[in-house]
Amino acid sequence: MKVSIEINGTTVSXEVXDRTL
C-alpha cells in the first residue's frame, strides 16, 4: 500500500506494509 503524508509543506511518500502506524 502506498501512502503519501504531507507535513509542514513537505510531502513524504512511501510504501508500507499491511500494518499502518
Curated annotation (Swiss-Prot):
EC primary class: oxidoreductase
Keyword Plastid on entry: no
GO MF annotation, one: oxidoreductase activity
Cofactor field: [2Fe-2S] cluster
Keyword tags: 2Fe-2S, Iron, Iron-sulfur, Metal-binding, Oxidoreductase
Keyword Plastid: no
Tree of life domain: Bacteria
Disulfide bonds: none
Cofactor binding note: Binds 2 [2Fe-2S] clusters per subunit.
EC number per UniProt: 1.2.99.-
Assembly mode: Heterotetramer composed of an alpha, a beta and two gamma chains.
Role: Active with aldehydes and formate esters as substrates.
Protein name as catalogued: DYE-linked aldehyde dehydrogenase, gamma chain
